[in-house]
Amino acid sequence: AVTGVQTCALPIFTIERLLQSTGRTIYIFITQSTGAIINIIMDPILIFGWFGAPKMGIAGAAYATVFGQTVGALLGLYFNVKKNREVKLSFKGFKPSWKTIKEIYEIGIPSIIMQSVGSVMVFGLNQILVKFTTTAVAAFGAYFKLQSFIFMPVFGMNNGIVPIIAYNYGAQNRKRLNETMRLAAIYGIVIMTVGMFIFWAIPHVLLGFFAASPELMRIGTVELRIISLVFPFAGYSIMRGGVFQALGKSVYSMYVSIVRQLIVLLPAAYFLSKLGNIDYVWLSFVFAEFFR
């Protein structure tokens, strides 16, 4: 049922790309931020049944995600209709172009695979964590919610550099291309470094948003501090992935993602879990980052 409802929010990705293609990335930031904030607000309400809402447990987290994505999609549709003058949304005279569809999939399939790899990684890691305690799974879920706020501006900048790099690559303007790549890498590293310090300084405050139990607080504090150590490296890697996408070579990012998440991270997490201490499992993220 949750999967069926969530498919209704899928158009948000197409809607956001329409805004990106015309340089209106500020609206993408607004839609994604709004969706993430609503998700975080609705999580405890639906999980624990606050304010008269039904107590849904784990399913509540899924429905909170669906609700946030749906609001983001509707907001993105509004921006396209009211603000995106270059794009007219209409099915009148609509006719598929197989050549265009082929070009889209040549670039899009690696991204599809990378998204799938991420889902497989999360599923596999949850299977490892649940052998310790379900609280560990909850802590991992809390981390993913929190890290979205740190990664969001970097992914937004990544979306912004793609058309700039692609345009200057086509125009053979190497000076501007190199300058864009340099500045993107610097800003990505700086933003993620700030995020690392936040996760190190106030993990208890961040986890408090999830009404964390003492056990979740202990597990989550160590988790946030260890995983955030590689945030600066991730900032650079995300920007590099944007360069590959702009040059039509996103397949390289796909290879890196597969190696990092499936060949390195999951096996490392599995073997580290055999040491009997859940804190060691988070070190797998540090090891895997060297293969990003």
List each language-model region with its residue ranges.
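Short alpha-helical transmembrane segments in multi-pass integral membrane proteins
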Residues: A1-A9, K55-I109, I165-V230, F271-R292
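Small-residue-rich hydrophobic transmembrane alpha-helices
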Residues: I12-I28, A139-F197, A201-P203, A234-V256
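Short runs within selected transmembrane alpha-helices of multi-pass transporters and secretion channels
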Residues: T7-Q20, I28-A36, A61-L75, F155-N158, ...
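Helix-terminus/linker motif at the lipid-water interface of multi-pass membrane proteins
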Residues: I45-M56, S116-Y143, F149, Y167-N168, ...
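Transmembrane helical elements of multi-pass membrane transporters/channels
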Residues: G35, G68-G72, G76, N80, ...
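Structural signal for membrane-spanning alpha-helices in multi-pass inner-membrane proteins
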Residues: D43, I47, G76-N80, N126, ...
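Hydrophobic transmembrane alpha-helices of multi-pass small-molecule transporters
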Residues: N39-P44, A73-L77, F149-M152, M196, ...
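Small-residue-mediated transmembrane helix hinge/kink sites in multi-pass secondary transporters
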Residues: R17, P44, S111, P163, ...
